[in-house]
Amino acid sequence: MFSEVMRYILDLGPTVMLPIVIIIFSKILGMKAGDCFKAGLHIGIGFVGIGLVIGLMLDSIGPAAKAMAENFDLNLHVVDVGWPGSSPMTWASQIALVAIPIAILVNVAMLLTRMTRVVNVDIWNIWHMTFTGALLHLATGSWMIGMAGVVIHAAFVYKLGDWFARDTRNFFELEGIAIPHGTSAYMGPIAVLVDAIIEKIPGVNRIKFSADDIQRKFGPFGEPVTVGFVMGLIIGILAGYDVKGVLQLAVKTAAVMLLMPRVIKPIMDGLTPIAKQARSRLQAKFGGQEFLIGLDPALLLGHTAVVSASLIFIPLTILIAVCVPGNQVLPFGDLATIGFFVAMAVAVHRGNLFRTLISGVIIMSITLWIATQTIGLHTQLAANAGALKAGGMVASMDQGGSPITWLLIQVFSPQNIPGFIIIGAIYLTGIFMTWRRARGFIKQEKVVLAE
């Protein structure tokens, strides 16, 4: 009975499931029934809008990416199925239905022990933690190790939500919100490491250009819509399209630049009253401690700098795929949401697209290399879910290329010791620096409050 109920809820998808969770959560916080319904509906509408814009990108840029690969005769055999392909496979895994209550219990335990301020209401994105557990289960054959993977991943991302809370608030202007999920959060530590290194390099540390700088310098020709149009022209030309195809693609990428920030607005309209109510109720009950509502990283995609970086990294990621030694993955399914990978980097670099380019190249290189290493397990996951054609192989950049997932696999089932040492050293250094950076911000805020 429990499994049937959970399966039905999961099949509703995030555009229905998240509003339901939000309505229930809002009611628990003491909001009026009408306000709860309105907030949940606005959030659902916003995510439908995001889905439509992402669908537009996937339908237009996806074929262009494949055409680019064929045009340049790229020898990449395994197609990235992206999160739209990976998430259903994950929910069909043996540990999926148990992973949801486990991840929720981890969150509750961390809140009660004051180890996190993040109150996660984004149940759908627990699939990221579940993916880690599912691959660990396949790699080791141990159900308990798979569950341990869910627990470790969950605890880690809730802390990431805490550590990047200042960036979420100050750069993205999301008051009372945390973004603990997906590539945006777990790629953030790499950006922190890159930013610290750049700060130490004389001359390079002074280079700065942002979406706002481009707009100021070029006027109407530097506006986001125009930048989107130009990026569409470049992608279309690289894909070998004719004039008609190039222009059609350019208008669609321009539309993405205009529409993405606008479809975020209904979500913010729904979240604002909930965040205020949550802060006041939870702080009153738990002695003034500030709490954050954990939500989907899609909220970050509406920022102009993130959209600009996304369009830059669509063709750039295909180039990176060619250059990464041993890579077998052709970027495809996740290209439309490439902004997830660099969104937190944009905030860490304070909108500096030069630094975002550097950290983004490193992030995507690591992602593709890890995605290649997990092809075997990912293919097995797809086969178990009945989502694999005979003789086929699958990969994904989102989660399939996750450092936390791959490092845990190597801990419990070592296969590539040199890679484990190198990736582990880079990632753990980034995590340490992220923790230290967050502590520094807290100390600064305490000094300001004291003054």
Curated annotation (Swiss-Prot):
PTM info: 84% of isolated protein was N-formylated.
Keywords carried by this UniProt record: Cell inner membrane, Cell membrane, Formylation, Galactitol metabolism, Membrane, Phosphotransferase system, Sugar transport, Transmembrane, Transmembrane helix, Transport
GO biological process terms, semicolon-separated: galactitol metabolic process; galactitol transmembrane transport; phosphoenolpyruvate-dependent sugar phosphotransferase system
Localization in the cell: Cell inner membrane
PTS EIIC type-2 domain span: 6-435
Pfam families per record: EIIC-GAT
An annotated Gene Ontology molecular function: galactitol transmembrane transporter activity
NCBIfam families linked: EIIC-GAT
Subunit comment: Forms a complex with one each of subunit of GatA, GatB and 2 subunits of GatC.
Name of the protein described by the UniProt record: PTS system galactitol-specific EIIC component
